[in-house]
């Protein structure tokens, strides 16, 4: 918390607000991180970890709900003005929402109402902890990106439920890290580079598999600027809640189009990794589009110790 407080103090000094993303990896948690067998909505094998995971008990589910509330309190202590709850991309809340990962036959699985139960409890806990002085934003999937996952029709119903719960805004994303990761990012994935930099010496077989059949394991999804725009507009038409756009925001024209289409804000990642001064250059008129090539070397070399060495290839 003290180190995060230094960060938020610096942000506030510049006149801006600070937000932090809160989430739980669920079945994508590495055993080396938690020191035990990872847990998720259902049991099974997760290739991303890679390990077998166990199904959460009801006590663990409710305890995790309480942990989200505690995390909000820590965020307040650290000086954050907003929390973003990650309910997409195949992390824990998403694992409960998606029929691809939720195979339960109790009140936490089955129909959509049951699959939303964990999410609803988490959001209520978060809203209670946030009180009136912190904003609550939720990142959701508009679609998971695979046949047995969530599709747009169910995702709109999930978004409407979050609107009823009183969250302040939704971030509209898509994709499933353990099954359809390139739906999130789009563009090329330098498989051999990713395998080389993976700090997973115990799982040499996974690194070898990535080198041999990585393109089948992580198929490329073509990149285009503002690639989620058409889908996000369907959500804009069905919801009254403030929406935040994400996905392929590299060109000034697209940024203006998004803001003029009823979105209150947009998020960027790779454009800022490529050039941390990108927004200032836009404002000064020095450029109108990020030079990011979407080679995704920033993803392939994201493992600890390598983060500062990829910018030259972005």
What is the meaning of each model-derived region?
Residues 1-314:
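Flavin-dependent oxidoreductase catalytic cores
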């Amino acid at each position: 918390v003290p180190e995060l407080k230094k960060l938020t103090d610096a942000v506030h000094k510049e006149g801006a607000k600070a937000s932090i993303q809160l989430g739980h990896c669920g079945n994508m948690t590495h055993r080396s991180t938690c020191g035990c067998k990872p847990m998720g909505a259902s049991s099974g094998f997760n290739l991303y970890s890679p390990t077998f995971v166990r199904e959460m008990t009801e006590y663990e589910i409710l305890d995790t709900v309480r942990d989200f509330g505690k995390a909000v309190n820590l965020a307040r202590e650290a000086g954050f003005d907003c929390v973003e709850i990650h309910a997409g991309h195949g992390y824990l809340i998403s694992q409960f929402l998606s029929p691809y990962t939720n195979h339960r036959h109790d009140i936490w699985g089955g129909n959509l109402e049951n699959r939303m139960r964990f999410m609803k409890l988490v959001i209520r806990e978060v809203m209670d902890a946030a009180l009136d002085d912190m904003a609550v934003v939720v990142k959701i999937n508009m679609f998971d990106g695979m046949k047995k996952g969530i599709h747009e029709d169910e995702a709109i119903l999930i978004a409407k439920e979050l609107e009823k719960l009183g969250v302040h805004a939704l971030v509209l994303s898509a994709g499933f890290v353990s099954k359809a990761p390139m739906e999130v990012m789009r563009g090329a994935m330098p498989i051999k580079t990713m395998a080389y930099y993976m700090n997973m010496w115990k799982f040499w077989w996974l690194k070898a598999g990535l080198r041999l059949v990585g393109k089948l394991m992580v198929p490329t999804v073509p990149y285009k600027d503002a690639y989620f725009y058409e889908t996000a507009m369907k959500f804009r038409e069905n919801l009254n809640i403030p929406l935040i756009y994400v996905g392929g925001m590299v060109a000034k024209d697209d940024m203006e189009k998004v803001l003029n289409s009823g979105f209150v804000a947009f998020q960027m990642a790779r454009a800022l990794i490529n050039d941390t001064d990108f927004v200032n250059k836009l404002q000064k008129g020095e450029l109108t589009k990020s030079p990011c090539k979407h080679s995704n070397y920033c993803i392939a070399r994201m493992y600890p110790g390598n983060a500062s060495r990829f910018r030259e290839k972005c």
